[in-house]
Amino acid sequence: MAGSSLPRRALGRRLRGYRVRAEKSQLIAAGLHIELSPQSIGRMEDGQKVKICTSQIRDLLDLYRIPNPSDDRDEIFLPWKEVKDQALAAKLAGTTKGWWQAYTDQYEPHFDHYVGLEAAATHLTTHQVVLLPGLLQTAGYRRAISLARDSGLSPAALERRLELVAHRRVRLKDPGFRVDILLSEGVLRHTPGGRSVLADQLEHILELIGSQPNVSIRVLPMDAGSHLGLLVQSFTLFEFPPLASHLVEPPVIFVEGYEGGLYLEQSETIDRHRRAITDIQRVALTEVDTKQLVQKIAKEYGV
């Protein structure tokens, strides 16, 4: 897709791996060879957009002692070709940025990366213990959360944040985007914005449950007993399709905190979170039983 961060992520992840293997610092790589700042090298390795040309990529590979020719070089130039092809296609279409980047004035810096991953993923699994995930939030629910975080938001800024959430929800209608949402029961009982806001939010969830084959919503009841969901904080697992070059990008775990977000890519960490997901799914209600529980809670709030 135009604006997808996936090829840039593949490029940056591999360049970082080669740099670490060659025991080169970002400063050396930038200062001695391609005249980029260390910050730019870091952004590139994080999969962010950086102005760089093919000759600079070659210079980096020479610095990292990557033989020419070699499979290691191919693993750089395959995603690099996709980055360039994507940029050209976007330029011809007049869409050189991802749609979400029109809202950069309305979210934290780390969230640009999050929405890019969300747009590129084909499977998202999220476990939430306090608040509903953005993909489920109604305008009223999102408004209450935004004002809780920043009570001084102008009406115009608040409206743009609501537009962003609405735009993100469109992906739920994509049959190629599988979404598994696991919610602690307490999430359905928090009342940001008051009882009427929660009532509308619960009604929205009831409309979604079972209505789209690519979206699963399941609740962990309070009486579920012991399970790993009691020990892990809220997190989201992103999984991605193969690139056009058939290279496969590993999954990413996102953990959000009050001061920012944490992106985890180590295979051991991914495996631990997969085990947590399996254990949470073991004790979560079926979608049928989830709907019955949501209906019960909704009646308490006037739905």
What do the PLM-derived regions correspond to, one by one?
Residues A2-R16, R21, D46, K51-H190, ...:
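Interdomain hinge/linker segments and adjacent boundary elements that couple functional modules
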Residues S5, I41, D105-E108, Y114-E118, ...:
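Short amphipathic alpha-helical surface micro-motifs
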Residues E23-R43:
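Short alpha-helical DNA-recognition segment
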Residues A30-G31, K49, C53, H227-L230:
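Short glycine-biased active-site loop of nucleotidyltransferases that positions the nucleotide triphosphate
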Residues S37-S40, T54-L60, V252-E256, H273-R274:
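Short acidic (Asp/Glu) and glycine-rich catalytic loops that position anionic groups and cofactors
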Residues G42-G47, G261-L262:
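A ubiquitous short alpha-helical element
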